[in-house]
Amino acid sequence: MQIEKKDIRALSKDQLRDFFVINKDKAFRGNQVYEWLWSKGAHSFEDMTNVSKGTRQMLVENFVINHIKVDTMQRSSDGTVKNAVRLHDGLIVESVLIPTETRTTACVSSQVGCSLDCNFCATARLKRMRNLEPGEIYDQVLAIDRESKLYFNRPLSNIVFMGMGEPLMNYNNVIKAIDMITSSEGLGMSPKRITVSTSGVSKMIKKMADDEVKFKLAVSLHSAVEEIRNKIMPFTKSFPLPELREALQYWYHKTKSKITYEYVVWKGINDNKESVDALVKFCKHVPCKVNLIEYNPIDDGEFQQASPESINAYIKALEANGIIAKVRHSRGKDIDAACGQLANKEI
């Protein structure tokens, strides 16, 4: 029976060093291989030109490098780029490059499909197949960084975990990927340029705070009225608003990092005074800002963008209470790359 080889990128640098020592080689070989895997983005052991042929053969016999492949790439009329990324087992996720005049942002996926069941999101209609490995997350960023340099002549400036999946339900792998992205041996990006978005997994928000992470936190809130929130995001019955509020207060107490609430206003759902007042009240519990996001409809038409007047009612109420609020217009709608639209048909 053939033994399945392990993805070498699942090993830490210390584990790689130990592997070489156990196999009667020098520990520094682990450093060389680690640099090839992360700093240089090697997809094959044959790429490792300063490693001896015998050592490369030993690696081939024991490990694989499970790298991703950009299957298809689409460019929007507004400059947005969407990648359909094929994983080593044939599954596909999507990632997006969002350019503006001052920055280029990578929107990356953390799961194949999604663990949650938000009724307004196309990704949530996909069955969750599996979590992404740290290397698969890292490779999405690497691919978008290359595209940013190619198309916009500048490196990637920001990363948001707002693609397919709930990042906090793949917590360990997301953290490992971010550690490599921010490491001098990886991309060397500041954690302050990284935002992890969650739909409100309270216990994991507390864990992040305890782990003293340095990246930013965004919460897809969409309603501060429990009944409405439970209807549009059924899983939130397990994470009620008082529990979420407590977790966010704990986060701010530990990190002193302001929270961003992501909020879509829908016609006939949360475009009413009760919802506006509830959001204002919820925002007063912890320093925050609110992004009011343009809705990107999916096929069935159940959810519709609220009127500009309804959105302005939110802005006026929030600003009157000293809360920063901005309307975020979606990018890449013509290629289904906008928020809530990622749902590759091949999955």
Curated annotation (Swiss-Prot):
Q: State whether keyword Metal-binding applies.
A: yes
Q: Which residues form the Radical SAM core domain?
A: 100-334
UniProt-listed Gene3D superfamilies: 1.10.150.530, Aldolase class I (3.20.20.70)
What are the positions of the active site?
Answer: E94, C339
> What EC designation does it have?
2.1.1.192
The places in or outside the cell where this protein is found are:
Cytoplasm
Question: What cofactor(s) does the depicted protein rely on?
Answer: [4Fe-4S] cluster
Record-annotated residues binding S-adenosyl-L-methionine?
G165, E166, S197, S220, L221, H222, N296
Q: Where does [4Fe-4S] cluster bind?
A: C114, C118, C121
Q: Which domain of life is it from?
A: Bacteria
Listed disulfide bonds for this chain?
C107-C339
- Which GO MF terms does the UniProt record name? 4 iron, 4 sulfur cluster binding; metal ion binding; rRNA (adenine(2503)-C2-)-methyltransferase activity; rRNA binding; tRNA (adenine(37)-C2)-methyltransferase activity; tRNA binding
Additional notes on this entry: Reaction proceeds by a ping-pong mechanism involving intermediate methylation of a conserved cysteine residue.
Task: Give the function comment from the record.
Answer: Specifically methylates position 2 of adenine 2503 in 23S rRNA and position 2 of adenine 37 in tRNAs.
**Official protein name in the record:** Probable dual-specificity RNA methyltransferase RlmN
Q: Which organism is it from?
A: Flavobacterium psychrophilum (strain ATCC 49511 / DSM 21280 / CIP 103535 / JIP02/86)
The coding gene here is: rlmN
